[in-house]
């Protein structure tokens, strides 16, 4: 286990770089995420786990969770990176300066962030997530990321995904497979059907 606290959060300085060479798993804590109240404040792009590359680990995950789990984890990391790139373009060009499709990609990455990566440690249910629940939520989010949606303006995109994220958050606070959980899941399915371009 290696722990580094680089000055100014600079992850490129020599001690951090050398620690990363020997560490199998690296959590990059980020002040910006903490300031935005996105907890745990772990940067999903700079963080990594080399265990995903180990055949023994891959075999265990395939047998205990799903054969497609690691592929989905890698996919959402790629989507997070694409979302960050688009966020930077929006900051430079403005909301009207990028196509509506870019806003959809950005908000799909926000969906991943809010639903899969963020966690409320003060909530008894959200603080501890069983593997079966993780698999269900990951599959649900990945399915939405694969779906095509129809929007005319970036405001429609933002309002739609904020509504979706809110329902997901309520699911995160509900006991897995409870009536309340199923109710929110049904609401999500109805919301997806409203805009999905089939």
Task: Identify the residue ranges that each predicted region occupies.
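P-loop NTPase catalytic core
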Residues: 1-169, 177-180, 185
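C-terminal accessory/interaction regions of large nucleic acid-associated machines
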Residues: 187-198
